[in-house]
């Protein structure tokens, strides 16, 4: 769906749209890499619920931005926003750890992984079908689903991190390269 939208917005051929789409995917991935530790740290400070809801709402707004995008720059901005909001998977993982017993945690993470897998299979198929109606239609539908998800979460999603278990925001914990320090403790995982 995105390549067709890039073609339309950027007035480029499919080959150039594929290259631009690759750069947009890189921008999305870089945003996730940079913001995942920050989101996790903010969730440790303010709780899981507000950041999950903010990310879901942000994703809905991002899909609207993508649907309305008049330029390639808007599409790039949209992919970066999607990466930032998408980095909330780290908060969802923490939420699962908060609300499940240790013996049930592997099952809960397995269900979360399965849900991601189903989404990666069904999402593009549905997006492709909706794309037949126009390259912006899938983004409008995704925005509606995200915003409905936000409303549902607003009324149903509990806070999983008690105030006494929260900790101050620490910039060093929000460093995306901090994970590499962990690898130094396990030299067997390094090439």
PLM feature segments, named:
Residues 3-32:
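Extracellular/periplasmic helix-loop-helix junction of adjacent transmembrane segments
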Residues 62-66, 82, 153:
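MFS-fold secondary transporters
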Residues 33-70:
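Conserved MFS/SLC helix-loop-helix module at the cytosolic interface between two early adjacent transmembrane helices
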Residues 78-117:
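Cytoplasmic helix-loop-helix junction between adjacent transmembrane helices
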Residues 115-155:
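Helix-loop-helix hairpin linking two adjacent transmembrane segments in secondary transporters
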Residues 158-191:
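Juxtamembrane intracellular "pre-TM" segments in multi-pass secondary transporters
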Residues 29-37, 87, 120-121:
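Residue-level signature of mid-helix packing/kink "hotspots" within the transmembrane helices
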